[in-house]
């Protein structure tokens, strides 16, 4: 595989911020006890993922489906792509033209795709949203009055902010791929030329 193009690792974390604050009370209750509390803030740029096509067939002939990197068409190329109506249990979900327009809007709303029209997406090109997490650590220490050791009870709350508001501390880790486009069918003519049809996925 030495000829493969270099790309970002799936596990690449471009940026990380970590802040910790802690406080321990003086001993109280006749020097039998003390209490410690720690607050840990952890933030990092999101997980990397690839833009691919959701294939119902082996689109690129590598023996696998669902792993073909997305070609991001120019406006003129998009106008020539063969979209088809999308159905769910015989009910029309989206017409071919609606699918084309939805894909065009998706391209304009994705920073990477918008700036790489006319190219194939590179592996792990995109980053999900930043993730923020606040963890709480509480420790209650009981001292032996004769100085023969101590007993400590701890209590941890992981992702404390998410307990207060479900929109805080959200984990955006994605699967390895995001597929805004499905290859609905792939026909091959007598000359071996493949002609795909497409419909749009509701990619986030």
Predicted feature residues:
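Gram-negative outer-membrane beta-barrel transporters
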Residues: 1-47
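Outer-membrane beta-barrel proteins
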Residues: 30, 44-51, 162-167
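A structural signal for well-ordered alpha-helical segments within the folded catalytic domains
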Residues: 12-19, 23, 132-136, 149, ...
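Short, solvent-exposed loop/turn segments that connect beta-strands within catalytic domains
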Residues: 29-31, 146-149
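Gly/Thr-rich phosphate-binding loop signature of adenosyl cofactor/nucleotide-binding cores
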Residues: 157-159
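Short conserved catalytic/interaction loops centered on acidic-Pro-aromatic/His motifs
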Residues: 147-151, 164-173
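Extracytoplasmic gating/loop element in the C-terminal half of outer-membrane beta-barrel translocons
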Residues: 36-145, 152, 174-203
